[in-house]
Amino acid sequence: MKLNKIKAIFPAIALFLTASMTSCMDDLEKGNIDPTVEPNPNLLGLYSKCYAGLIMEGNDGNADFTIDDAGKSTLLRNVFNFNELSTDEAICWWSDGGITDIGYNQCMPGTATLRFLYYRLMSNITYCNHYLSLEAAQADKTMLAEVRFIRAYNYFLMLDFFGDPSFIETITSEVPKQAHAYNEKFDESATYTRAELLQLGREFLFNWVKKELENAEADMLPAEPETDSDANYGRADKAAAWILLSRLYLNAGTYLNNDGQNNPHWDKALEYAEMVINSNYAIFDDTRIPTEATQRGYRPYDLLF
């Protein structure tokens, strides 16, 4: 199988999600969208907020939750920290907020940076739950599908980073249960080790995210590249669902049986990756940058990041 192709396109999802914010910025000043304060917010403002949670700290420079530094609350920053600083790919010279713990893979429940990632993901999920619960939101199936995709992406990150997080799909005052409690294999009368509960949570979230993405994909926009002059620029389309499904299947060995070497879903990972590769999207390579930029020594990576 051409699994090397899969690796080549995964960085595109981060770029896509970052670009997704461009068309939503003007819609954030739409009044209060906190479900505990305003049960019927401006629909477009809340829809935009679901996208904004992928890249922004908050609407006005402050974070969406209590934190000493709003910049530490952003999703992209925290995803980078835990994906890269925990390896030999990157190192951070400062030590506040538990950054050093990430570098040494010694994070504890009290590690500040770990809590910031969890708070951000749960905040994003709450905004999506609020939007999806509104009767007025049901009228536009495409926007509804996009928010389902965004929520599924946040839960995918919960699955990937935490395994057995709290799980909730609605706006409620009830204390949410952890994901393992929703696995049909879970028996409340039985005794489990923490590792067993973790695996039950992973299995449940894997199947839930997969189903959500499959259902959302049907109503999402066609997989077509857009420019900033197009009305749908920055909106998640079918290709976003495909690449996330590919990523989900790629790690299914760990999510389903805690064995990264025994993955029954390699073919599905390849199938969805090739759907993106064979779509009208293309890698941003040397043929797509201005001649002047090439003459000055710029590479595609430099212009993107």
Segments (PLM) and residue ranges:
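Short coil/turn linking the two alpha-helices of tandem helical-hairpin repeats
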Residues: L159-F161, S166, N251-G260
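Membrane-proximal, proline-rich intrinsically disordered regions
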Residues: C24-R77, T287-A293
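Bacterial Sec-dependent N-terminal signal peptides
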Residues: M1-N32
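Polar, glycine-rich mid-to-C-terminal structural blocks
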Residues: G253-T254, L270-F305
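Acidic, serine/threonine/proline-rich low-complexity intrinsically disordered regions
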Residues: I171, A181-Q199, I243, T254-E271
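Conserved, well-structured interaction surfaces
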Residues: L44, S48, E57, I91-P165, ...
